Amino acid sequence: GQKTGFFLDQKYNRLAMQRICKGKKVLDCFTHMGTFALNAGIAGAVDVTGLDISEYAVSQAEANARLNHLENNVHFRQANVLDELPKLAQTGEKYDVVILDPPAFTKSREATKNAIKGYREINMKGLKLVKDGGYLATCSCSHFMTQELLAKTVKEAAKATHKRLRQVEFRTQAPDHPILWAADESYYLKFFIFQVVDEK
């Protein structure tokens, strides 16, 4: 991976996704090694697509699918997510579950304003692909993007795409990545699961 190879801080969030993926059509964006996609497949998702810009990551994800005997229903494709999602929307593609696990859009306080635009954009693009009554899982791994700020940004994305959100779950990093109250930067991972309903 870009840092650690498997991102163990997300391990329980992947398990949480299993509860809503059985029998579903799933899109995993920024899939990297395919870990969210594979967990969806293990849970019984009928059709899973993982997207990542890295050719190497996609090859590793495909190998992981084969190792887990999931190659029949879990597939990966090299693509720039920001470009690919609008193309999928134009063709009328819809998913029961869309997962957004982007790399950190900001690593400094000064860049937070631009990061907010990035998170808003990717969530708008993702929301357009969620079926009425489906689910969006979205997260940020930057400690500068606080829980409140991420929630506000996703809410703005929902308003812009005429969607209503029902928060199903809020999660953070695994316990072996402890949050130290004396070190703000230790609280970096925020993970929301929303049910998405079209505005009537």
Q: Whereabouts are the PLM-identified features?
A:
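C-terminal catalytic and target-recognition region of SAM-dependent MTase-like enzymes
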Residues: 121, 135-200
